[in-house]
Amino acid sequence: ILQRLLGGDRCKARVLVISPTRELAEQTHKAFEMLGKAAGYRSMSVFGGVSTKSQIKTLKTRLPEILVACPGRLLDLMGQRVVDLSGIEILVLDEADQMFDMGFLPSIKKIIASLPREHQTLLFSATLPQEIRALAKQFQRDPVRIEIGASRPAETVSHFISPVSQGDKYEALRTVLGGIEEGQTLIFTRTKHRAKKLALQLTNAGFNSTSLQGNLSQGQRE
């Protein structure tokens, strides 16, 4: 994508990446920022959960060549007429199946409808449900489908299952954590409430623990 940008216009958005979450948007933005630094290309991430004022100021000062955005905030800024997408040459729909699951498909169609007729669309998706195939058929001409084999767990990762009752889960987890000598541990829970409660329990038990869940503000996430 960066190679395609060489020799073209500056100070206008030429690449638009649509991401389902703010974390993925920020991660993608930082990757573009690092890779495009030598060529002088600017990247910007746009997502909700933070004030629009700083985003609008940046967009009005100098529009970055690469714009990484979540659908909701991008539509908001488009409605305020502070985003010019008339120069977009490449559109990337990242984690398209996840965006469909989150209900973003109508928003994505609105965004695509505002883009120039001549642009390339790249669609990245772990799965290809009917809705995503229909989207590709509607907005892509003569698409090339590239499939990558399923990733395998690292050989250094061990797997085991411990059947325990609900009431014994915490003590079983403490036993497992107590056997880990160093490094970080990532624990997945079913709900946001459970993540917050478990992090507090582990902190009280002497572990350096924190929760990462949907109720956190952007500042807390960072």
Please tell me what each predicted stretch does.
Residues 1-222:
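Conserved helicase RecA-like core
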